[in-house]
């Protein structure tokens, strides 16, 4: 049993190292304007009031490229507010604090939860409290949810978008690293999804699978040629 636990810990640690190695961090402030343009674009239907991503960034300056790609490029997701949530677990048993960064907007919120090791990481519960706090302080406009069995509310609905990394074919990894990542993702599947870990409402989930990396050197530089043929007219 001890050997199995050691193997799992080793695979998880090495897999996390590889994920960080191949993560492409972007300077978040450079994308505040594109997010604002999407937020204000009336031609794109609003997906939800609050679009939430779980973010592993260690600071508020950078963010994983895949998150911004999901919002701006992969079926542009317009929302009243964009939330990027990360959590830090402390050695103290009962810590419940949060810090946030808005980049001078009232629709972009980077939030870091500081939780004790005994506290459940119930992101949806904490986030609703934070949204209520920010609406009360005037930092977030009321979202005016009119239709609910609980009556009207200033807090709108939520969508949680979870990105699952996958290893694409011919990714350029060594056989050992590819095996480590595939084993880690198999363990993750057995242990439960992020939705279960963070207590998210599964009815409000968007799950997207993204390749861990793209082997640029494997792309062909040749162009396909258009053939000439006799035109057929009716």
Label each residue range with its predicted role.
Residues 20-234:
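Cytosolic C-terminal regulatory domains/tails of membrane transporters and channels
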Residues 2-13:
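Hydrophobic core segments of alpha-helical transmembrane domains in multi-pass membrane transport
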Residues 11-21:
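Transmembrane-helix exit/juxtamembrane "anchor" motif
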């Amino acid at each position: 049993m001890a050997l199995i636990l050691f193997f799992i810990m080793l695979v998880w640690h090495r897999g996390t190292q590889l994920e960080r190695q191949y993560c492409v961090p972007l300077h978040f402030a450079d994308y505040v304007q594109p997010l604002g343009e999407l937020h204000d674009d009336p031609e794109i239907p609003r997906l939800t009031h609050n679009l939430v991503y779980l973010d592993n960034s260690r600071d508020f300056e950078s963010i994983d490229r895949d998150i911004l790609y999901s919002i701006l490029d992969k079926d542009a997701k317009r929302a009243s507010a964009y939330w990027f949530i990360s959590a830090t677990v402390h050695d103290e048993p009962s810590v419940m604090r949060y810090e946030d960064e808005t980049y001078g907007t009232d629709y972009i919120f980077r939030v870091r939860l500081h939780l004790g090791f005994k506290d459940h990481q119930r992101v949806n519960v904490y986030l609703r409290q934070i949204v209520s706090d920010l609406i009360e302080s005037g930092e977030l406009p009321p979202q005016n949810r009119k239709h609910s069995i609980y009556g009207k509310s200033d807090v709108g609905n939520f969508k949680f978008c979870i990105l699952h990394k996958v290893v694409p074919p011919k990714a350029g990894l060594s056989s050992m690293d590819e095996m480590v990542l595939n084993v880690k993702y198999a363990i993750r599947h057995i242990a439960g999804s992020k939705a279960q870990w963070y207590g998210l409402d599964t009815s409000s989930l968007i799950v997207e699978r993204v390749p861990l990396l793209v082997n640029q050197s494997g792309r062909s530089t040749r162009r396909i040629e258009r053939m000439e043929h006799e035109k057929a007219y009716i």
